[in-house]
Amino acid sequence: MYPLVRRLLFLIPPEHAHKLVFAVLRGVAAVAPVCRLLRRLLGPTDPVLASTVFGVRFPAPLGLAAGFDKDGTALSSWGAMGFGYAEIGTVTAHPQPGNPAPRLFRLADDRALLNRMGFNNHGARALAIRLARHRPEIPIGVNIGKTKKTPAGDAVNDYRASARMVGPLASYLVVNVSSPNTPGLRDLQAVESLRPILSAVRAETSTPVLVKIAPDLSDSDLDDIADLAVELDLAGIVATNTTVSRDGLTTPGVDRLGPGGISGPPLAQRAVQVLRRLYDRVGDRLALISVGGIETADDAWERITAGASLLQGYTGFIYGGERWAKDIHEGIARRLHDGGFGSLHEAVGSARRRQPS
């Protein structure tokens, strides 16, 4: 069924298709019996999938990645779609329109996306009001970024303001300094710039705080950020954001689409490399959320055994459809049982722990 729906949706410009899907999801969420039925059909049911990470109970490890539901307008839909949690955003302290359209492109031959959305959102205050009015049944993280018009020198106050507004209402917060679509944002990943931002957000809220990093960092930069996250007692790291690399793409004419971040399978190999390096560096001292190129249960299992406590997807959901999260969760549960693991936590990092020293 979904392959036909996808072919029809792919006839529409990507951002218009996105809005259409959102309208359908909001309609579904508004009808409680339908929402409950979908949750029974698509939601995770095996208790072996549940885990407690940074003090939050997750019914299953695969969540919706930030960027899909930027303003939390479909909060009730994500549990019904089979996700174990959802990350809303990126939101900024002030509303902003993002970059001019067109700004979202399908790379169909690569099952990938290119986006240069630019943090279009209604602002942290609007999201806070929405979160206060409605609490879904799954954990809801919030991804916060810097307002484009805010100068880099005032980034600390900008992130602090967002944390103040949404922190008390989120299951966890993610500090996003890694989108390639806000000028100068990735420069904030340098430790001397990142330290005051993370310290300010940590001081502003008791909610678990994570940092989201780019896949294009050098190994030494990855190590520095991992060490900083441990030093500041962060809850974890989200790895990774989209990549600016165009290596290996097969979709014709991609260079003519202009700048932006690539998500989906072209990112997978680097995302796994980053995850393994981070886990080898920090072990169980931080929770690692792996995102980037996860399409199948095999992909998900590779990330879990490489050190990911939680997973996220966006592009895989677009190409995979409504059963995507369910199929991955069923595959993870099957591998846990077949491998003799008593819990998801036991499997996290198991492949790395077996590596010879």
UniProtKB/Swiss-Prot annotation:
Cellular localization per UniProt: Cell membrane
A single GO BP: 'de novo' pyrimidine nucleobase biosynthetic process
InterPro entries: Aldolase_TIM (IPR013785), DHO_dehydrogenase (IPR050074), Dihydroorotate_DH_2 (IPR005719), Dihydroorotate_DH_cat (IPR005720), Dihydroorotate_DH_CS (IPR001295)
Pfam families listed in its UniProt record: DHO_dh
Named cofactor requirement(s): FMN
Enzyme Commission no: 1.3.5.2
Main location: membrane
Catalytic activity: (S)-dihydroorotate + a quinone = orotate + a quinol
Taxonomic superkingdom: Bacteria
Active site: S179 (nucleophile)
PROSITE patterns linked to this entry: DHODEHASE_1, DHODEHASE_2
Residues that, per the record, bind substrate: K70, N115, R116, M117, G118, F119, N176, N181, N241, T242
Any one GO molecular-function label of the UniProt entry: dihydroorotate dehydrogenase (quinone) activity
Family, per entry: Belongs to the dihydroorotate dehydrogenase family. Type 2 subfamily.
Name of protein: Dihydroorotate dehydrogenase (quinone)
This protein's encoding gene: pyrD
